[in-house]
């Protein structure tokens, strides 16, 4: 599918007369949105935070689950937030307000 993504981006950029970066960005957002909906439906979780990154040279893409690091006593949305103490177990420099990502 990697090659198809590159062909799609090239065709859309030429057809709409926009830069490939704009098309890549829109495609990343669309894939992230579809992933959020699918996971939320399949797991009955609140909406999660997801980021998709497409390699501009190969067309390969990665999906990352994301959580915002919050104070331990301010952990209201477990599907989108991670408590500072939990984040610190995985990362030495966990700081409130930063984003923790997992592929």
What residue spans do the PLM features occupy?
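Charged, low-complexity terminal tails
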Residues: 1-103
């Amino acid at each position: 599918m990697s090659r198809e993504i590159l062909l799609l981006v090239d065709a859309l950029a030429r057809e709409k007369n926009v830069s490939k970066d704009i098309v890549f960005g829109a495609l990343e957002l669309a894939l992230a949105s579809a992933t959020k909906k699918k996971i939320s439906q399949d797991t009955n979780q609140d909406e999660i935070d997801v980021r998709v990154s497409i390699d501009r040279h190969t067309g390969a893409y990665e999906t990352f689950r994301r959580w915002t690091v919050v104070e331990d006593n301010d952990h209201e949305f477990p599907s989108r937030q991670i408590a500072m103490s939990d984040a610190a177990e995985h990362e030495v420099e966990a700081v409130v307000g930063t984003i923790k990502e997992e592929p």
